[in-house]
């Protein structure tokens, strides 16, 4: 597991902090879901630090590098957000979160913002307020080359690794309840389980498994796109309107300089190379490409047409059977 910047005293529930290049990095203990009032934008400005929840083990989006520094696509954006709201990239306190704790960290006001590859869903939107999106994803499935999973049907009788609290867990639980899921709290734990054979495949955002497979040559992404095209967005505590509006304004204004394309070039292209087109991932100004929506609509239309054709065939077969019965009588 990647080196942590700080030690968490689990027995006492305390968190240790360390200063690094002006930014504060924190790993906080779970307090069991207590709620607290979020800080307003004015309070954040008065304090001089914005608290942002990020992943520490989801390379290349939020991770700790070999020098002990937090890096990634989400982190790059977090630093820019701090600069534009407070005056400096150093005016940010990064707190490490797990997938299943993202909502709780907002509800308990441990962080002001979550920038941890947070997929927008209706269920989550009931608990937090999402800002405009800055990325789009689908699910992917990575597995060993010598037993490559290329279709969901290949998972029958197999063990699929997922991380708790992710859209992958929800998707397979709701759509493929017969597939055995092996669940972990952290991404690094999930990848370790895949490497040592405790599961046959791992599903999470396709952007991540594609990056991981690039660095682990005996593994490949046999299913590159599964489920809907979803969006990734910042989130704040429910009702923290001033901060939400400020983030939305920031995302809109950054479109003028194509900021998230620069973010891609800086943090993702070194991992993906030319294997991923930034247009398939990047969202500028909070506006999702209309082609994605059109593709989803077309897919739904195809499904509807197929269902209708199936119904017509069944009706024709029933009619033919009735006619044969009448003739026999």
Regions picked out by a protein language model, each given a short descriptive name:
Residues 18-36:
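Sec-dependent signal peptide cleavage junction
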Residues 29-35, 76, 80-84, 166, ...:
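Extended ligand-binding regions for polar small-molecule ligands
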Residues 31-115:
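Extracytoplasmic small-molecule ligand-binding "clamshell" domains
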Residues 49-54, 71, 152-166:
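Short loop->beta-strand "edge-of-pocket" segments that line small-molecule binding or catalytic clefts
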Residues 56, 135-143, 206, 210-252, ...:
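Periplasmic-binding protein-like
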Residues 79, 91-154, 220:
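Acidic, polar ligand-binding/catalytic clefts
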Residues 92-104, 147, 182-192, 196, ...:
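Short helix-initiation/N-cap motifs at beta->coil->alpha
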Residues 101, 118-126, 171-174, 188, ...:
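A ligand-binding cleft/hinge motif common to bilobed small-molecule-binding domains
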């Amino acid at each position: 597991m990647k080196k942590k910047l700080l030690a968490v005293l689990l027995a006492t529930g305390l968190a240790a902090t360390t200063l690094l290049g002006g930014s504060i990095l924190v790993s906080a203990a779970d307090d069991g879901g207590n709620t607290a009032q979020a800080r307003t934008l004015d309070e954040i400005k008065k304090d001089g630090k914005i608290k942002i929840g990020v992943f520490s083990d989801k390379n290349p989006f939020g991770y700790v590098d070999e020098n002990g520094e937090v890096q990634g696509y989400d982190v790059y954006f977090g630093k820019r957000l701090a600069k534009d709201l407070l005056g400096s990239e150093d005016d940010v306190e990064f707190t490490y979160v797990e997938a299943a704790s993202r909502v709780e960290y907002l509800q308990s006001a441990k962080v002001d913002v979550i920038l941890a590859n947070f997929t927008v869903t209706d269920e989550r939107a009931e608990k937090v307020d999402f800002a405009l999106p800055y990325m789009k994803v689908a699910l992917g499935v990575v597995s060993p080359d010598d037993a490559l999973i290329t279709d969901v049907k290949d998972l029958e009788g197999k063990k699929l690794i997922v991380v708790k609290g992710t859209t992958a867990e929800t998707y397979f639980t709701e759509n493929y309840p017969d597939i055995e899921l092996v669940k972990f709290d952290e991404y690094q734990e999930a990848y370790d389980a895949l490497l040592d054979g405790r599961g046959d495949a791992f599903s999470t955002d396709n952007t991540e498994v594609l990056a991981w497979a690039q660095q682990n040559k005996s593994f490949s992404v046999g299913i590159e796109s599964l489920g809907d095209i979803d969006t990734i967005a910042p989130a704040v505590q429910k009702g923290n309107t001033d901060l939400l509006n400020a983030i939305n304004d920031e995302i809109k204004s950054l479109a003028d300089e194509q900021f998230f394309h620069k973010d891609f070039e800086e943090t993702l292209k070194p991992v993906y190379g030319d294997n991923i087109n930034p247009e398939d991932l990047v969202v500028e100004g909070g506006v999702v490409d209309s082609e994605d929506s059109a593709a989803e609509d077309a897919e739904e239309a195809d499904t509807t047409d197929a269902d209708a054709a199936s119904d017509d065939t069944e009706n024709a077969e029933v009619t033919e059977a009735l006619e044969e019965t009448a003739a026999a009588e």
